[in-house]
Amino acid sequence: MAHVSLNNPKLTLEGAEAVLAAAKDQASRMGKPMNIAVVDDGGHLMAFARMDGAKPASIDIAINKAHAAAIRRQDTGPARIGNEVNVLISLGLAIGSRAHQTPIRGGLMLEVGGQCVGAIGVSAGTEDEDTEVARAGVAAFVKG
């Protein structure tokens, strides 16, 4: 008989929309129009916003950041060996996955009890700006 967890937390649409709203609020406070994506634990899109003035070229990047964080079960960023960034591995992951794995920061996991239930991806600013907006979304999720 297979063992099945009865307590399997899932990201709801309401939760995804709360994450999205908090991230949009932060981007507005910063004066940075962003593309913001929220996905479930399988990397499937649940909520998305392209703020007025956000770069169209960043739409897929935001979605890919969220997807990568969810399916890899870690925040996005460059691949590392020890404390060193490995550019070749980072590029290999991005190319080999048709950009679904990204070495660009701005994709953060949403966790419940140490378990990934989804992720947020933000794009259109610098990596630091994208990450700051994503963190606001995560903070709303943790708080809620």
Feature annotation, model-predicted:
Residues M1-G144:
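Flexible, solvent-exposed loop/hinge segments and secondary-structure transition points
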